[in-house]
Amino acid sequence: MVASIAGEEEPAAEKSQQSPDHFQPYRPYYYPPYRGYPITYPYPYPHGYPKPYHNFQTIAKPNEGPTDQPEANSANSIEEGGVSKRLFIEPIFNLFRPRPRDPIVVNQAPPPPPVIYQAPPPPPPPPIFQQAPPTIYQQPSPTIIQQAPQPSVTKLVYSQPEPSHSVIYQTQPKTELVYLNQ
């Protein structure tokens, strides 16, 4: 019994958890403003309330047909005994209409110039090694040295003891003394 009751209650609990908007993204509902509440636009009215930027020039007055005078058919015209709706409604919507504001200029340095990517230059072509022509070494011509004729040298042989100097060179006549004690 308990198992059957628990088994019957489980599908009911699952149905209660699964709401129709369970799989829809959460969107909060904005209630329409009551009297005296500040109106903030844009206001997401789900029931199709007129937008605050509606052009009141195009709204035709009820129970009036088209006339030859275009000003009489517009909301900006002043009726007999009354004032135009535009004079009251337009300023209210202008309070909440976003106005263009001057941009806040801060003393900043000028932005750096954009970096333009420049591809590196291509590498230089490999050097072409040209074989130099073989150097021909020319042997110099042999120089012939001609020896001048030497003057005749007379050798004088003495049998005397060696003096203080062994060789005596004389210029004219050129003589060479050779001793036996050498």
From Swiss-Prot:
GO cellular component, as recorded? extracellular region
Please list where the region (Disordered) is annotated: 1-26, 56-79, 104-136
Residue ranges under compositional bias (Pro residues)? Answer: 109-128
Which superkingdom heads the taxonomic lineage of this protein's source?
A: Eukaryota
The residues forming the signal peptide are 1-7
Locations listed in the record: Secreted
Provide the tissue specificity.
Spermatophore.
Q: Which controlled-vocabulary keywords does the entry list? A: Repeat, Secreted, Signal
Entry function: Structural protein of a layer within the wall of the spermatophore produced probably by cell type 4 of the bean-shaped gland (BAG). Fixation in the spermatophore seems to require covalent cross-linking of spermatophorins.
Q: Under what name is this protein listed?
A: Spermatophorin SP23
Chain's gene name: SP23
